[in-house]
Amino acid sequence: MLAATRLIALHKNKGMTVAACLKNRTDYIENPDKTEQGQFVSSYACSALTADEEFMLTKRQYDLVNGRRQKSDVIAYQIRQSFRPGEITAEEANKVGYELAMRFTKGKYAFVVATHTDRQHIHNHVIFNSTALDGSRKFRDFFFSALAVQRLSDLICLENQLSI
């Protein structure tokens, strides 16, 4: 079996700001106890330490470019990617997760990849901003996007000689 994946739309929690929700989500995935003191955290077009704030800046830019506020529906997306126990090192898993995020977002959305080693199976959490880097649009979660993530993950696993 190749890596199992899941695509999850992240929404704003009631009683919390979008910024606070983003901070909670990024803090969880970057937890030093789960990522060997942050050793297995990488990012694209943002700093992992300030990703929540940088995501918010892009959302504000969207408001300015489009002359309207974003609906408070999906604030970010999370991809979970789990590997069979003993199949991959945390460093390799982080590289595979980064490649999955880069290819899925086509480099148009900032993201953070955190590889967790606190369970028997190594797994990645990828959070990418729902707003494009240039502030022009939001990610469109198409009908088969979860299947597209799984197929792309399978392809990357095969390219990296991981088991089928």
Please annotate each region the language model reported:
Residues 1-164:
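N-terminal nicking endonuclease/strand-transfer module with a His-rich metal-binding environment
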